[in-house]
Amino acid sequence: AFQYPIEIPGVSNINFLKTALAEIRAYKGLAPLDAKEFLQLSREKQKLVEFDAKLVNRSLNEGFSGGEKKRNEIFQLAMLEPSLAILDVTDSGLVIDALRIVSKGVNKLRSSNNAFIIITHYQRLLEYIVPDFVHVLYDGRIVKSGTKELALELEEKGYDWLKEESREKATTI
C-alpha cells in the first residue's frame, strides 16, 4: 500500500483484481477462478473490509477520495492475500472514520499466515492496530525496538532523544 495510491484510468478495479488474482493463482499452480467464483469472493471480501461495492467497477483509484483509495488498498489485500504486506503511511490524510475502517480491515486480515509492516509517523494508528513490535528507523537503520509502549513514549517525548542516543552509539563504535 502506498502513501499516495496512484490512479490508473481505464483499468477497472475489478479487472485489475481479476488479473492479479489469476496471476497469483497461476504462480501457485492453481486454475483461475471462474466468473461466478470470482464475483462471490469479491462480494465476501467487500463485506469483510467494509468496501463500497460501487467502487469495484470504477477505474483504479480514479476520482477516489484519499479514504477511498486507502480502503481500496485494504480491499486489494483482502482479495490477493499476500503473506507480507507493507503499508506505507497508510494513515496519511485519513479522517478518523476512514482510519477506523482501514484499521478494522487490517485487523480482520491479520493471521498467523501473514505479516504486516506498517510505516507510520504517528501513534494514532496504533490506537486501532496493536503492533507485535515497534521499530524506529533513523538514518537508514533501526535504532530502537520495542512494543506499543515505545510508540507511546515517542508520542510523548518526540524523536530527538533517540537521535542523540543513536549518535552516541555511533561514536562509541
Name each model feature, range by range.
Residues 2-83:
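ABC-family P-loop ATPase nucleotide-binding domains
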Residues 82, 86-93, 97:
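Walker B catalytic motif
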Residues 99-112:
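Helical segment within the ABC ATPase nucleotide-binding domain
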Residues 95-100, 145:
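Conserved D-loop-proximal element of ABC-family nucleotide-binding domains
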Residues 133, 137, 141-164:
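Conserved beta-strand-loop-alpha-helix hinge in the C-terminal portion
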Residues 163-173:
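ABC-family P-loop ATPase nucleotide-binding domain
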